Amino acid sequence: PLSKLGWAHLTLRHLDESRDYYEQALRICQSIGDRASEIPVRYGLAQVEMERGRLDEARRHIEASLEIVESLRGRNSSLELRSTYLALKQDHYQLYIELLMRLHRGNPTAGHASAALQVSERARARSLLDALSEAQIDLRSGVDAKLVAEERRLQRKLNDMSAAQMRLLSGKYTAEQAAALDANVRETIDLLDETRANIKRTNPGYAALTQPQLVSVERIQRELLDDGTLLLEYALGEERSYLFLVSPSSLQTFTLPPRAEIEARARRVYDLLSARAPDSRGGTPQQRQARLAEADAELPRQAAELSRMILAPAAAQLGEKRLLIVAQGALQLIPFAALPEPESGRAGERVSEGARGQETRGNSSFLSPSHSPTLPLSRSPALPLSSTPLLVKHEIVNLPSASTLAALRRETAKRQPAPKTLAILADPIFETGDERLKLSEAQTQRATQPDPDQPGQTAAQHRPQHLARAIEAFGEANDEFAFPRLTSTQWEAEQIAKLAPADQVFKALSFDANRQLVTSGKLSDYRIVHFASHSFINARRPDLSGIVLSLVDQRGQEQDGFLRLHEIYNLKLPADLVVLGGCRTGLGKEIKGEGLMSLTRGFMYAGAPRVIVSAWEVQDRPSATLMVKFYRYLLGPKQLSAAAALRAAQIEMSRDKQFAAPYFWAGFTLQGEWK
């Protein structure tokens, strides 16, 4: 095709020939009305014109390309297909941001930086925004009852097949059996998606839904921030990356190193932060201790280098303000609270854009670190860097996008708060061999009181056989994954419950912490919902990720205790806060442009504007200790906001020699509304 010839000449930098082929291809696409094929042609023309220095012409082509992308995406009623489609077009958004920033450098007063931030927002979390918009209506109201019944049937079938898949994979099976069942699961998911799409198409209110509104820079400044809050939005690019720093009165941009360089450093920092988590390398206790000592020694240097890369250019602007972080790529794994506080030094290229478009250019430059994949420390002139964690001076809040925060505020502003304070689900039964099945009620009361002074257990130390292999194949392919009892969570629940009046608290422990309770609607009466249990991640099928609740009933019979993400989306949960105290609840499959497909999204869609999640597997006892401290600041005499309470609890933990390592306190982050 002509477009491929255009691309071939572009790679050879034969720009005139490339443009000619692309323009011929564009004329053909327009003459036959092939809008889908017009997308890559316009993208190619934008690249050619950028190389020729014709930036305004390049902008015309890339904007036209993205208008078609977003139009075609909007025609698909499946949120999953929308997100997948947009993921394939992320290079278009990256090109547009780079183009606008080049225009910005040439004319800093023309508002190009604002336009670049707007494009960054267009590229992010669009399916989550769509879902939040859909939450405004009852999608099943006024729809053919047969369609609704079919959806429920397929949901039950999917749950049954998911459980059957786990049972199969936990016993003896052939590769053919596993492949056949996986194909059936995939087919059922496709049928369920198709049924839901039909429900949307036939819903009287769905057609009237407008596309979710993306916030402008002016709206961010006016509605989402205050004088004590900054927005830091990262846009990672192949040649260079950008940091957009927004205050109520200004927009500043900083040029950062390329995506590959930042992501390599970020992944290394994440590995070092989570080094104490169980792993599959085995070895003697002495070998493990040696690995931890090596990680502890390397972490300060690597974290300092990451801080230099992504924070130091803007250090002079941070002060002691609250930081709203919109991360991208591997930066989503990083708890910014654990990074060292940068100090003012040589900043990156900076251009300030006032609230009314008045801009001033900074004179400093940024020297990026070495591109070596072995990640040596930068040979660039060292910036002054404090050893103090960012947490000490700043509340840190994570957002999928600024537009998501606006949507969450819009939805929660309309509703009445739930009448009661706190619901807690903790310490479920995971195995038929659990001692609580064998003891009398009085014995159970004595035997299940955990000793908070005893070391916690992790999956690596205590792996039950049933379901372990299933999760290995079905979820993360991690042979350390299992469901040991979290012995400190009952102590955690009891301590937290004491902080609110008894008639305002609901506790579901042991057998009562089950899936049926969550799906019954009972939790909608509570402003705070706290889960203290395991989670599981299905990287291949994100909708089948979820939370593990009681897998055994009081008669000792196995039951479905897996609360899956696709079920969380269907909850009606108008809570102010959901806390997921289990391991790795903030992780999930990354889809470009959408971010991590974690449990956070499901609970936001269900109605929670803020969710606390974890980034790695933390031992039972320190996790429970942190949660109790958090609730003391949240519900105790100080009555702090959720963001401030989490920060205060983490600072307190970090000053305890026993839990001073960031692994113990930095993994929990607040996602969503900061107020």
Q: Model-found features: residue ranges?
A:
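TPR/Sel1-like alpha-solenoid repeat signature
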Residues: 1-9, 21, 28, 38-49, ...
